[in-house]
Amino acid sequence: MISFALNGEPVHLDLDPTTRLTEALRETLGRKGTKVGCDAGDCGACTVMLDGAQVCACLVPVGRVAGRQVETVESPAPDLDRLKRAFLRHGAAQCGICTPGMLMAGVDLLRRTPRPTEAEVQDALGGVLCRCTGYRKIISAICDVDEAPTGPVADGAIGQSLPRLDGAAKVAGDNFGADEAPEGSLLLAAIRSPHPHAAFRFGDLAAYAARPGVAGVFTAADIPGRNLFGAIPPFADQPALAESPARFRGECVALVAFEPGTDPDTAGFPITWEPLEALITPAEAEAQGAPRLHASRPDNRLIEGQVIKGDSHRALEEAAHVIEGHMQTSFVEHAYIEPEAGSAWMEDGVLVIRACTQAPVMDRDETAAVLGLPADRLRIIPSAVGGGFGSKLDVSLQPLLGLVTLKTGRPCRMIYSRAESMASTTKRHPAEMTGRIGCDATGRIVALEFDGRFNTGAYASWGPTVANRVPVHVSGPYRTPHVTARARAVHTHGPISGAFRGFGVPQAALWQETIYDRLAEKVGL
């Protein structure tokens, strides 16, 4: 028996002493305010106080807190409450997933240094990452914790800052995807491809499903509807559960549902992999004779977009100055702190799925098609989103949750690990961009030519939007009389590329502004 004080109250737990403190708090004690972002001590979302000092709860075995004092964001301590009110006053919680950790780090500092400098606040928050805010309002809230609330300068909304409608929930650490699930929910674990391109075959799934603690095994053969989804319906091409072959590392090919309280260990799952030739770069994918990822897309091209205005070739031939340039950008991970998470259950004949999402109506339509349900028999409840930045516009675990609840009649839940989230979700499109820009003798732009090749990965996602939007925006905010701009999205066996704040325009802007700078230097501006 492990005994300790939690927020001033005695707690007694019969747990393996190596159990993470985060698991003990969240799963055994139901204290969901402490968040799990990485399970590796990197993000600090799980920061709690242990004997008055901040620690990452994901790195602390529960056996090490025996006889000690643990304080979490649920603590009734007056100074913590005061700091929460300061966070609300300053609007310091944006997505909110890091807020409980920030509050604990802030309280730790304020108890040692009641009137800290900004530099001291920055140092105290060094172990807690925030992906959204830039830290300004968080720092201000801690520095101004004792500041009296400023009264409104006018009646109504005009002239005053309005409190966030969801602010209280965010400072309490409530309402995220991993925080709620019906009692007795099955826990889902995904079987994912360890290869960028591989054929696979299953062994004796029935024998595996008969193992103690396993409630069921599910593959593409169990999907009752159309095993395809996509953010843009005419381009839908991604299976909820892949049929051989898997087209990218991290693709889900099967699900295992475990009974509650069971260790969701998929070791020994009966599957055999046969690695196949992988097309990693767009150049490889467009090479003559390269195998197609999708039979209906020659040269592995998803789509091409273009904008043509005037006669750019002639204008550049006549231009006083011309600069050519080539640039490459890489995949970029969205790096939200909250991994994908959600739960599903039946309610009065309606399948209910609660998950972190940026697009609940799109989720409903895509998931209903996969599960063969009319839209009025499926409800999507969006939880708070602990960072999204475009990636959570795409469906992730919603069809998986729905499938298991439909097949078993039981509620279920699923929480991606950090590694799963980074492997299986969308990224910013890598780009290869070439072109030239010309101006007259006075430096006035006369023409632009641009060709962009964007690595859209194994499936379409938002690739069509990127390929069509880039040619429209590549000339930037500058008057350009003659433009020829083309972009194409190319399939590879890399991660799926999707929406990420700008739909390809930031990549094009890097190229464009660099060329403009070089052109300005040449002209002497």
Where is each model-derived feature located?
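Signature of N-terminal electron-transfer/Fe-S-associated modules in redox systems
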Residues: 1-157
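Short Pro/Gly-enriched beta-strand edge/turn motifs at strand-loop
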Residues: 27-30, 226-228, 317-332, 414-421
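Beta-strand segments within the central parallel beta-sheet cores of soluble alpha/beta enzyme folds
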Residues: 37-40, 119-126, 376-383, 409-419, ...
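Acidic, glycine-rich active-site loops and adjacent beta-strand->loop/helix elements
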Residues: 64, 76, 223, 357-360, ...
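Glycine-rich loop/linker segments at domain edges
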Residues: 91, 160, 166-172, 300-342, ...
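Alpha-helical support elements that line or immediately flank enzyme active sites
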Residues: 102, 111, 189-220, 254-273, ...
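Glycine-rich and small/hydrophobic secondary-structure elements
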Residues: 142-143, 155, 172, 234-258, ...
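Flexible, low-hydrophobicity surface segments
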Residues: 146-303
